[in-house]
Amino acid sequence: MPKRTDIRKVLVIGSGPIVIGQAVEFDYSGTQAIKALRDEGVEVVLLNSNPATVMTDPEFAHRTYIEPITVEAAERILASERPDSLLPTMGGQTALNLAKALAEQGILEKYGVRLIGASLDAINKAEDRQLFKAAMQKIGVALPKSGYATTLDQAMSLVEDIGFPAIIRPSFTLGGTGGGIAYNREEFETICRSGLKASPTTTILVEESVLGWKEYELEVVRDTADNVIIVCSIENLDPMGVHTGDSITVAPAQTLTDREYQRMRQASLAIIREIGVETGGSNIQFGINPKDGRMVVIEMNPRVSRSSALASKATGYPIAKIAAKLALGYTLDELRNDITRDTPASFEPTLDYVVVKVPRFNFEKFPHADRTLTTSMRSVGEVMAIGRTFPEAYMKALRSMELGRVGLESPELPAEKEEREKVLREALRIPRPERPWFVAQAFREGMTVEDVHALSAIDPWFLRYIQMLVNEAQSLQEYGRLDQLPDEVLRQAKAHGFSDKYLGRLLGYPAEEVRAHRHARNIRPVYKRVDTCAAEFEAYTPYLYSTYEEEDEAPPTDRQKVLILGSGPIRIGQGIEFDYACVHAAFALREAGYETVMVNCNPETVSTDYDTSDRLYFEPLTIEDVLEVSQREKPVGAIVQFGGQTPLRISVPLEKAGLPILGTSPDAIDRAEDRERFAALIEKLGLKQPENGVARSHAEAFKVAERIGYPVMVRPSYVLGGRAMETVYDVASLERYMREAVSASPEHPVLIDRFLKEAIEVDLDLVADRTGAVMIGGVLEHIQEAGVHSGDAAATLPPHSLSPDLVERMKDQAIALARELGVVGLMNVQFAIQGKTIYILEVNPRASRTVPFISKATGVAMAKIAALCMVGKTLKELGVTQEPEFKHVAVKESVFPFARFAGVDVILGPEMKSTGEVMGLANDYASAFAKSQLAAGVKLPKSGKVFISVKDDDKPAVVDLARRLRSMGFSLVVTSGTHTYLATKGIEAQVVQKVTEGRPNIVDKIVDGEIVLVINTTFGKQEIADSFSIRRESLMHSVPYYTTVQAARMAVGALESLKCTELEVKPLQEYLGINAAPPGTRR
């Protein structure tokens, strides 16, 4: 069936900010979908609030709205753009929920817009657990025993029948938000309350426990002619009970019998037909009881998902692109497979390799959170590895994780035998992020495959391979010396995924010596293609992975090449922003005539799409893996400054091994990162930094802190995302920090800085070329005061309170620093301003996480310009010598995962905790801030009671805010100290007890829904601890809270702006003065 002619203009909804459960994979799928629609001549309008995405670049969609993903904003866009269709399947749960709301409120009908990709009926049937259950019963597909509840009482009566443990799954939520596993009545009540609150329809499913069953997923694609294909089967190594996003997964499924696979396949076809997904991809999850083979369906997603991104990367089959074209009316047999160019898209991919995905967690950022993995997703990123066998792919995946582990090393265990056994058995029984290493340790301690299976419920097939790897490591150790190791033994170890570093650890040699020995014996990897067809047809896209076999499938070309090192797994502190920079580098260098070679191991990203670069190596970002690629490809050089800390960490050894590093030299990077060299640099240029010192032992730390005076900021050297960074208020806190957070040593010193009270922090990004010319990209003023990590702080561009003179002085200082360091490419400087004094906090001669934001706001593609400077172009040649000028305001706001981690304090500090960001664009600061809050999911109130409690220093500043709130009709609720102060200024307010003063107190009022906004500032360890429950309950009850006066001031301005005017929506292209397709007309 050829393409429909009635689809000419489509609104695509993106997924908004990166959150746990909905991450970078939707930038990948959205970018693919937009390209596919444009290729077909369709006009594309995009709504997405996330500026760090490639899809929101102004050249992708015809009209790009970086606006809150809300019904109000979407309706205004529909009214002005008048698209004929809406594609909701590329933006995760956020897009589906918005499309559902627009349809049910009659807004789509009002503007004559149809849903494509998935009908409202299909969305409801798949997402509403009650309708899904009825649909499954109709076609005779079994589900776990379950029932629905819209109240706690209904849930309690259901569990009487279902029994414990019980699984709670809220409807229409993301990544299992609000759900969990309850083992008793108390846990059940707590999880049900949070599930009912999390579900937009206030419905939960209470389900019998299928804990310990095997879990599988099928990626299914269907077209309007009812052709259905299975793109990929995925098996979870972790059994049921762990969210699939938190499980180690393997593709294709390894332990299904052919009969079981056919049953599952037939069920999938019946399900996708009954639900009614006609055009596009769905992900269907199944559980199988290993004891009797009983199969049940768990759930389905009627959209592109995290798993479909993984399946696309695992198979080379671009699900999102195909789904977008199917939504236009094509059938599978009419579409070509890009990789082979010969086969139609209706051919199911065949794999002659194994893919392993391992999730990446960030529990170290939330030390008080429970690390147990359940049905509510907690991982922030993932890695994927490809090998010819499961052991090879598994070992490659584990070393891709960047956890400091290079293989199956022993985890820490108590020395005492009984205690050791108890800890080990618990680590096998309870799923936590470190379980893979405990499984290996169990075999070292003499446990059998049956013992480990009984405790962990991991399938014996996987356990036997892990046991084999442990035995192999032990027998390698017995050789004792490299020259005693037979070539065939070394070759087999490499074929099983043992890295040079792991072999070196086992034999007592540095990795370089193992590598030299291996090369001398001519043991090197070959590279195979991911080709969708197990090498049956020729593949045209070089999408490659390494393995230790004979035949090489993709010899390098003789073109000039640049190697780009990606950023590995997403984690807090190293997010999508760095992938964005790598993608831009690939685009720019390809346009400049270079062959681009990308190395990365993250399946969620645009950088690992098969057509982003000329050659893609899906490999771990380790010295060994990168050197093997570079020695084969022989690039003119490598770009390491775009992928965050991951490539920077390995840049010096790569340079030593003969790989030229493009742009800023590794030595200059070290001058900026090494505290003592940095202090000398600041002194040489006559600049200032906060008083500081370096401690190489506990005793030194106390001396330095005493000299500087408390409070101080403490942190380890060479970190990203403020890892283990803390504000310390007294000797006792420093003692605890030194004991628990870091181990200070000559190699790993601890940095101690004076804490700058009441200072304003500023980020500045620039590009420099080889001649010393500099272009300032933008200056961002933080809304929170100094002391909050720059990745967490809200910020405005241009600055909102700094004098032009101060801004010019900062620019001059940044240019002097760039020239002194010899920066070629990007550089970021963080300043703190106290009064009229400018302090330099840090200099990062690399891409920073603010680059995409500044590039979006100004229309200047900084990463592209920087990449071209790194291969020798000058800013003058590129025609960008002036700082970009613009008349609008952009506000960056961060998004946090606190709701997923019970008991974690939401107060911000020097350690980064946000997972993503949003942007507010408007012509004034108040409206831009209001948009940023709405985009971040903050519900700004129109009326009601505002709670104010501030530290003494902030009392004068809060008077004006209190007056403005009163004049808007809000009433004030305050603590006694603030009440006394406001009374002297003639401001009326009601007094409420502090948490420490008895009940009913402020927390009771928040829980009872009486408070609509919280302004609560604190300083000092005790005050912060005392007010913890105010912040936590505000978060859990969706009450906006502001913990600094600056943020409260912006919020009050935003409330005034919302009172006076409707927020307008405007495409990015209009803000930037870029010509886009004319709006409003259907052509």
UniProtKB/Swiss-Prot annotation:
Residue span of region Oligomerization domain: 403-554
GO CC terms: cytoplasm
Residues reported to bind Mn(2+) 2: 299, 301
A GO BP entry: 'de novo' UMP biosynthetic process
Residues of the ATP-grasp domain: 133-328, 679-871
Signal sequence extent: none
UniProt keyword annotations, A-Z: Amino-acid biosynthesis, Arginine biosynthesis, ATP-binding, Ligase, Magnesium, Manganese, Metal-binding, Nucleotide-binding, Pyrimidine biosynthesis, Repeat
Name by which UniProt lists this protein: Carbamoyl phosphate synthase large chain
Native source organism of the sequence: Myxococcus xanthus (strain DK1622)
